[in-house]
Amino acid sequence: MKNYKRYSLLSIFCLCLIGISCNEDFLDRQPIGVFSETALTTKSGVQGVLIGAYTGLNGAMYGNGSSAGADVNSFSNWVYGGITSGDAQKGADIGGSRSNIERYESAPDNTKLDDRWRFCFDGISRCNDVLRIAANVPDLTDAEFKSITGQAKALRALYYFHGTIVFGRLPWIDENTQDYRQPNERILFQEMEADLKYAYDNLPETFSEVGRINKWAAASLLAKNLVYQKKWAEAKQILDNIIASGKNNKGVKYKLLDRYHDNFRIVVQGTLADTESIIDSQYSANDNSNNFNGGLGDGLNFPHGGLPTQPGGCCGYSQPSQDLVNAFQTNDSGLPYINDHNAQEVKNDQGVESSAPFMSHKGTLDPRIDHTVGRRGIPYLDWGSHPGKAWIRDQNYAGPFQPKKNVYYKADESSSMVNPDRRTSALNHRLFRYAEILLLSAEVEIELGNFEQAQIYVNQIRTRAANPNGFVKMPDGTPAATYFINTYNTPWTTRDEAHTAMRFEKRIELAMEGHRFFDLVRWGIAKNVLNKYLMYEVTKRSNLAGASFKDHNVVFPVPQRQIDATKLPDGTMTLNQNPGY
């Protein structure tokens, strides 16, 4: 069984002692406790501070004792990478600062952006504290020192990555920085690469505790960093090593789980059978943390209503788009409609009362649809058949579909894996899983001209999806829909053909996991793809009327509050606003 014990109280305690939280300025940290860093310069002290660095992956801003901003801080990225990507609508009802993000109308004074900036630098600050303290712990062995500092550097790179994909240029702040007022002159992938190379070279393969970043998790982050830099040959070397030898921190070799949906099951996550996880945001329930450790970042993304007969306490956010749902259709060969997936639509119950009859879509579908999207008439995990409109906050605003991957099973409530608020649970968020390694490898092989090998990697993922043991079933054991999926059997002959197939596969496999927007930007196709999406989706959702994606929307604005807070005494700005804002 998964080890649900977390060190949350220790981490909060340690962070308060050394004053990790941000006050007026995002890194202007003043001690607020009675113990100094010197008091933490012990083996147990530095481990406690390291645990605090991991704690930030939950998205909750422990530094100020609040869960405020957890939805935009969470590395599930449902706000910045989901509702901006064409995969999802904001959901709930009209209005709010998230609507501006969804419509590509973010302004520098958007408080959600300030939350994300402060959160990323809070995490970076925690990692820097670990590195500074570890250097002065007298009785650490060489192996212990390398393990602690390797984890801290991998985490620092992770926080920087999730800040970079949102804001672009960031200031570099490390353990030796004395003045936090540093310029944001360029993208910091080289600094992240150096941190990750150190982690890859120095971290052990195994740990006794669930959730710690090991050698191969660092390698995976490094490979992704190299892909972002288009260092294809270097990335291939790392990716090939991961595929050949990569193991989780229990020493079990990475491989795809036999059943796709087991990635999103509490009873599988963290066990020896969990061979696909590379890095999870570790969540727990009923651990005396006032629900802080239970995935606050996705706490809004449940069916609306909060009744005992449905999961969650609220709130109907992050609703899959019709465009995404249509992408799961398959043709007579069991392949996706890559170039015209919106030519025909998956049937939905828009405007149909839950008490009225409804016939589900009868065409062939990729089976991953019903592990990704909640739709009328299909079992919603073990909560019974999705009733449609009764669980939707406002169909007219955001449509008839609901998220599924972030939702716990009803059985999890009876096994104490759900917190009393019913909006948080022990269901981890997969930050990085082995399927993404295969997709990154496919991308690299395409860039290097190895189309056949790229197709092999993509087909591994499609073969797993085709496993009938992983299909959603009706109570009588029959498939819940007409599932039909096949592998690619005709060779890809051009780079464009291979790219198009690989990118479509990545959308389907990782749908609603917060990656797509950043991939579209990285591939240089965001403007074309997202404006095409808006032209289609606005015919379904009037709230998108007038929205458009412009060149500068590839990154978000630097929060004005941070620009103001980091001015020099003479009024000179150290942070520059991104172009177009």
Annotated model-derived regions:
Residues 2-6, 18-44, 192, 223, ...:
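Bacterial Sec-dependent N-terminal signal peptides
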Residues 23-151, 155-166, 171, 176-177, ...:
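Short acidic-aromatic linear motifs embedded in glycine-rich loops, typified by GG[WY][YF]DAGD(H)
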